[in-house]
A protein has these predicted regions:
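Hydrophobic alpha-helical connector segments
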Residues: 52, 66-91, 139
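Short, basic, alpha-helical segments at the C-terminal edge of helix-turn-helix-like DNA-binding modules
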Residues: 55-61
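Hydrophobic/aromatic-rich alpha-helical bundle segments in the mid-to-C-terminal region
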Residues: 111-116, 120-123, 129-174
């Protein structure tokens, strides 16, 4: 892992635990375990730190979802929602970091672009896993809804989304 990736990983953890508004750049420097000069060399603004953290988390999340992935179809969807539940429990108990960044920086074009790219990639992955590109946007909404509901509902949100996804892809919903 390069120094920049290592810093992005530590920034991801800091933002995940403390949110985007609370940590100052000095606190982020401490969390990244580098000097302020080194931090700014790799990420010249707090917004670029957010983008670096989001990019790192995006790659980590997609790798996590693909780990042990069965062939496209029902088993792959079940796998995805089970992995989502594990991710929420262990890595995102407060909800989706990308959406938190979007809310914290609503007008920042680079952050909006990073979040939008993450969401587009999720729709593409759902299309591939389900083998049903026609329902991928609806599957995406189930994925996002489960992520958003996690802090209140926990595993019940995941189970409900998985159940609805299976009904949707099997054609039991109109």
């Amino acid at each position: 892992m390069s120094l920049q990736q290592d810093i992005a990983s530590r920034l991801e953890q800091a933002f995940s635990h403390r949110g985007f508004a609370e940590p100052s750049v000095a606190e982020l420097k401490t969390a990244a375990e580098v000097s302020l000069r080194t931090l700014y060399r790799h990420f010249p603004s707090k917004e670029s730190m957010v983008i670096g953290a989001l990019a790192h988390r995006h790659a980590r999340y997609l790798d996590f979802l693909r780990e042990g992935l069965p062939a496209p179809g029902k088993a792959a969807l079940v796998h995805l929602f089970q992995r989502l539940g594990q991710w929420m429990k262990n890595d995102a108990p407060h909800g989706c970091l990308s959406m938190s960044a979007f809310v914290a920086f609503p007008g920042h074009p680079d952050i909006v672009d990073a979040v939008s790219q993450h969401k587009r990639d999720m729709i593409q992955l759902l299309a591939e896993l389900s083998g049903r590109p026609d329902v991928a946007p609806a599957l995406f909404l189930l994925h996002e809804g489960a992520s958003a509901a996690w802090p209140l509902m926990g595993e019940h949100a995941i189970h409900a989304a998985e159940h609805a996804a299976l009904q949707l892809t099997e054609g039991n919903l109109s």
